[in-house]
Amino acid sequence: MKKDFKIGCIGSGFIMKDCQIPAYKSAGFHVSCIASRSKDKAKEVALNHNIPVVYDSIDEMLEHGDFDILDIAVPPEAQPEIIMKALEQSKKLRGILAQKPLAMDLLTAKNLVNACKQKSVTLAVNQNMRFDQSVRVAKSLLNSGKLGDIVLATIEMRAIPHWMPWAQGLKSLSTFIMSIHHLDTFRYWLGNPNLVFASTTKDPRTKFSHTDGVNLYILEYDSGARASSWDDVWAGPAKEGAGEDIYIRWRIEGTLGMAKGTIGWPKYPEKIPSTLEFTTVGDNGKWHSPVWNEVWFPDAFVGTMAQLLRAVELGIEPEISGDDNLLTIALCEAVMISASTHQAVNPSSLIESN
């Protein structure tokens, strides 16, 4: 894979400075320049990671920056404008790696996808949970057929995210920021569901106004498979003085085998690898437990950028393409609509109506 594409980074917050740029350095990718809403923060990141050029503003970098790939890590409401400006102003632009959510509504996301197509710029969306090591190995097991026909897949999250200040005022809190990871993972594992049932309640710890805190949802598939997640961002009064029981567990049950695992990120900044175990009907009760040293944050971010670089080099669609991500955004919309109407929602109908 060609690694010397020049990557221009926009943003200097946690995801960019602690996850994406360190991952790129470890993989040998070339970051050529950076800009942020705060030049001082951009300069600090550049100094820490030996990035040669810092621009005074995002607009200056978009117009004059020497980069082939644009890597964006900004709050979701700021992202669409940056993408549109990049398409208009950047001279050499060949690919964009956008943050999830691509946009906070399906129509805006569709417009961004179409605008990139019109400019022949490859768009990928940073759905990085797909590149968590246990999630990736689980997909390999599914592809191999070792688990048989899938009956049930579940994710149980009891973890406390650190909501950023920019989350206040968004139309969605948990669904478009946290649950989007699990919804996209179910799509990655099992494909697109036909119906969604959801219920949500507010997170008592979050003081600003919001509608979706603790999310519960069930996905129905025509194959008969079911998927469900409990996205519990409250996780008990662990921050208020009680003991804590923090974890994310997942499980996939098939007719020929099952797999289960844990996700390590709730222990961040301690680097705890995710885990996976699997067993099949031919194993006489034995469980297989592969191990690795890599962790979701930051190592999974190598995978998302590599997807884009490979797609640009070969002239193909990345697995995490803008078109694919529209289906994840539709699933997020379906969760919110179902929770508010107390009715099942078909995500495909939302794609067709927008």
PLM segments and residue spans:
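N-terminal Rossmann-like dinucleotide-binding module
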Residues: 1-49
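Hydrophobic residues in well-ordered beta-strands that form the structural core
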Residues: 16, 55, 97-98, 123-125, ...
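C-terminal helix-rich "cap/oligomerization" subdomain common to oxidoreductases
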Residues: 1-3, 9, 69-72, 271, ...
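Beta-loop-alpha module in the N-terminal Rossmann-like domain of NAD(P)-dependent dehydrogenases
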Residues: 49, 53-115
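Active-site loop of classical SDR/Rossmann-like NAD(P)-dependent oxidoreductases
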Residues: 15, 37, 294-305
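Rossmann-fold dehydrogenase core element
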Residues: 109-129, 147-155
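Contiguous beta-strand/loop segments that form the cofactor/metal-binding neighborhood of enzyme cores
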Residues: 1, 177, 183-268, 302-314, ...
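Predominantly a Rossmann-like dinucleotide-binding segment in NAD(P)-dependent oxidoreductases
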Residues: 129-218, 342
